[in-house]
């Protein structure tokens, strides 16, 4: 299955604009983002931590640190960080989206669904959130159909539905593994 995606490094720059802050500090955020995009995850994390020691409430730096932690495989730390962002900035859909991605990676689909439903409720035009919510629903449907088939192995209708969803989820995974771009990673404009 192709898990819903985290905002890409390129989209992180745009997300930093959404998570607006003081222009004088933007250069340092851009430096951290450059380190992140070029794969210097350790350097980016150290830089983000130094920056956040001086600016602990900076949403842009916190968001970027969450992306870095997720890329480093520090899922629980990233979940804690994105959860804090949702508490401090409940109007922003991106932290909810990334929480959902992390929950889905842990097969916590109910938590992922809840986070994505909040993201699209706070920002109904957030296409990435709707797409990822569809992916989570599809995975949950596959699990339910699998359970139904385990209870009634002769049910051809359930087998057909399960096969369709597995094919859809498998096609998404093949496209991502082949490095084909996945549409819709742009964060929305700030809510007014």
Predicted feature locations:
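Helix-start (N-cap) detector for alpha-helical repeat units in TPR-like alpha-solenoids
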Residues: 25, 59-60, 93-94, 127-128, ...
């Amino acid at each position: 299955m192709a898990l819903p995606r985290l905002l890409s490094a390129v989209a992180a720059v745009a997300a930093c604009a959404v998570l607006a802050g003081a222009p004088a500090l933007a250069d340092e955020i851009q430096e951290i983002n450059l380190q992140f995009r070029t794969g210097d995850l350790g350097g980016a994390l150290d830089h983000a931590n130094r920056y956040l020691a001086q600016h602990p409430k900076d949403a842009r730096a916190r968001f970027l640190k969450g992306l870095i932690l997720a890329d480093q495989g520090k899922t629980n730390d990233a979940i804690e960080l994105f959860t804090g962002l949702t508490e401090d900035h409940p109007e922003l859909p991106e932290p909810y989206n990334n929480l959902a991605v992390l929950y889905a990676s842990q097969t916590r689909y109910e938590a992922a669904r809840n986070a994505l439903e909040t993201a699209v409720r706070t920002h109904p035009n957030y296409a990435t959130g709707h797409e990822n919510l569809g992916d989570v629903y599809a995975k949950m449907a596959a699990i339910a159909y699998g359970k139904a088939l385990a209870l009634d192995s002769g049910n051809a209708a359930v087998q057909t539905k399960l096969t369709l969803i597995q094919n859809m989820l498998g096609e998404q995974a093949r496209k991502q593994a082949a490095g084909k771009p996945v549409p819709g990673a742009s964060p929305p404009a700030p809510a007014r």
